């Protein structure tokens, strides 16, 4: 086997082995059971300053004890399709162990401060909460 075909063989073998470790369903025991996904539409959607303020406020939420993980993002430049809504300004996904953790988050002083500091920036908020099955 020459060096080039050996590398190809090893790369293919590694890719095959790796494929077994990704793409499967997450078990409820490995990941937090509740996802809190929030979409924000800014009053001034073209204001980079307002977006920066919102993102800075969202980042404070990771300090809350019951938050197991956080993802903050803006619309991706993916293919335009009828099922894709990229009209929002920013989104956050928070991960909790359970509903009690999400309830504690809602009442936490850091969350309340975030709302007090940033609610003037948005005109619309949509929340999707989901539990693992």
Range-by-range predicted roles:
Residues 25-28, 61-89, 120-132:
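Short, glycine- and small/hydrophobic-rich beta-strand elements in well-ordered beta-sheets
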Residues 33-42, 73, 79-106:
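Short, well-ordered beta-strand segments in beta-rich or mixed alpha/beta enzyme
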Residues 21-49:
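C-terminal segment of N-terminal export signals and the immediately downstream linker at the start
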Residues 46-51, 102-104:
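Short, conserved charged micro-motifs
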Residues 8-11, 56, 60-66, 86, ...:
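An amphipathic, aromatic/His-enriched active-site/gating alpha helix that lines ligand/cofactor pockets
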Residues 2, 18, 128-133:
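A generic hydrophobic-segment detector
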Residues 1-16:
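N-terminal secretory signal peptides and thylakoid transit peptides that target proteins
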């Amino acid at each position: 086997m020459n060096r080039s075909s050996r590398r190809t063989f090893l790369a293919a073998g590694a890719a095959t082995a790796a494929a077994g470790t990704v793409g499967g369903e997450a078990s409820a025991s490995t990941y937090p059971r509740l996802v809190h996904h929030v979409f924000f539409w800014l009053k001034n959607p073209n204001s980079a300053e307002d977006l920066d303020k919102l993102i800075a406020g969202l980042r404070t939420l990771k300090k809350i004890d019951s938050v197991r993980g956080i993802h903050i993002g803006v619309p991706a430049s993916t293919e335009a399709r009828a099922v894709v809504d990229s009209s929002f300004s920013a989104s956050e996904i928070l991960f909790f162990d359970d509903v009690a953790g999400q309830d504690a988050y809602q009442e936490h002083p850091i969350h309340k401060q975030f709302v007090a500091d940033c609610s003037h920036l948005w005109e619309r908020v949509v929340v999707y909460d989901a539990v693992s099955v």
